[in-house]
Amino acid sequence: WPRSVFSITSTTKDQQSKRLLVFRQDSARQNYKLWGVARLFSGVKMPSFEISKTGSAQGTPTDTGLVMTPKAAVDAYADLLQNGANSKYASKFADDDLRSKLADLTAQVQKAKELNEGTQQQTFEPVNGAISVMRSADGGDLVVAQINSEWTRSAGAGRESQPASDAEKALF
């Protein structure tokens, strides 16, 4: 324990993209609870999994025999989010929509901040122990983990910082 079940949703009638859902059961006598949700961007290729009576095996954060352990991969991806092309792990990961959209939004905000003499800072930090791993049919791992991000923006003197995206507008 804990045990995890991974599920992929269908595209909805209103064309909402597929989601990867992770349900976790912390002990034998507890119900499964939704633990994680990840939006599957267009073009995502999922690995194959064992479809049998027993299903795919659970992986661990310290699985070996891979390019890096799942925990190390999460730490490396957080470093890549933090440092972009300057990350020492940049060559280990293919380009992806999340980083592309984040880079575009960051550049857009930076341009506005420079015009009004503001500042911005982003940090990305993996959460220790917040990881679920499922073994794929080819011996790899599908890793879902929590990486907290904090984006601090300050407007120049006498100015106000506005939400930078539709998601931020919904929160404010």
Model feature map: region roles:
Residues N31, N83-N86, N116, N128, ...:
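Detector for Asparagine
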Residues W1-R19, G118-A164:
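Surface-exposed, charged secondary-structure patches
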Residues Q15-Q16, Q25, Q30, Q58, ...:
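Residue-identity detector for glutamine
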Residues E50-G55, R159-S165:
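Generic alpha-helical propensity signal that fires on short helical segments
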Residues D14-A76, G140-L142, F172:
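Short beta-strand edge/turn micro-motifs at domain boundaries
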Residues T9, W35-A38, S52, L80, ...:
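Generic signature of intrinsically disordered, low-complexity segments enriched in small/polar residues
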Residues W1, S48-Q121:
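Core segments of small alpha/beta cavity-forming domains
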Residues A164-F172:
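C-terminal structured domain segments
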